[in-house]
Every structure is written in structure tokens, then in C-alpha cells.
């Protein structure tokens, strides 16, 4: 499985237009695209959002690169700068709830980005410290992680903000106990 994560910075006052664009243009444009397994979009603030797409393979994503670029060019009218894009093979993840394509269910996304000092150490931290927190949590839908070179990106989607916030506190405590500076070059950034 291969992921592409796009993090746009939205212009002030453009959030509602961007939401409509994603619902009416992006989701319909990519519906039934061969090799595209899932697509998720979230607004993480008044001027920030996340689009995450899962593909069968890197080649499946590359086969629609022109379509992706066309839609990004159209979305530029909502952005204050070019989006940050991360891509990579899945290195961790689990589906806790199966949600059908046409099923409407709220989800609260938490995505964390950090520049890893050692990718293996960060992956071990996720498996040994983060996964047990996930396993004991209520309301978790899906988790995952990729590396784009030495940048680690992990995410989780929750049924409610309360469930996400409760887990986020435990996850931050785990990171603090491990010493974030031993794992990452600088602080991690969380989008929620």
C-alpha cells in the first residue's frame, strides 16, 4: 500500500469554499479510480487541511499523476502557498473498524509529522509504545504510518474528538517518556 498525503495552507476565509471543492470536485473526480483504495480529507483549522489517499502501489498513484496535478492546480485558488506533500509505502497500520464506501460516519483525524533521526528507532517507538495505546483505546477507526525519506508521518482516525483527545494525551506522555529529542530532529507537528 502506498500513501500520498497533501497538506495545503488555505487562504483566510476560504475554508468553506475549499470544503465544497473537495466534496464536489475532488471526491467525485477520483471516485472509481483504478488502484485508489481510499481517500480521506479533513479540515484541521481555519487555514489548514489534509488530504490522504491510499493506493495499491506507487505505480497506481503515478498512473494518475496528471489528474492529481490538474485538480491541485484548480485548488490553488484556495491556497496561500503550495501544499506540502508526503509520499511513501505503509510501514505500519491497522484497520480497527471497516467503514463502507457510501457509509457516512464522522471521523476525527490526528496526523503527526516529524523529522526522524533514525527511521528504525521511530518505527520501533510506534510499534512498542504507540500501538499498545491504540489497542487499549475506544473509538479508533484506523491507524497508519509512512516515511518520506527521513520524515515520519503517522495518523489515526477516531469516532469522536473526545476519544482522540484522550489518546493524544497518552501518546504525548509516551513521547515525553521516550524523549522526543532522541527520536526526532526538532519537535513533531500534530494536525487535528
PLM regions with names:
Residues 1-50, 56-192:
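Short S/T/G/P-rich N-terminal loop/turn motif that feeds into the first structured element of a domain
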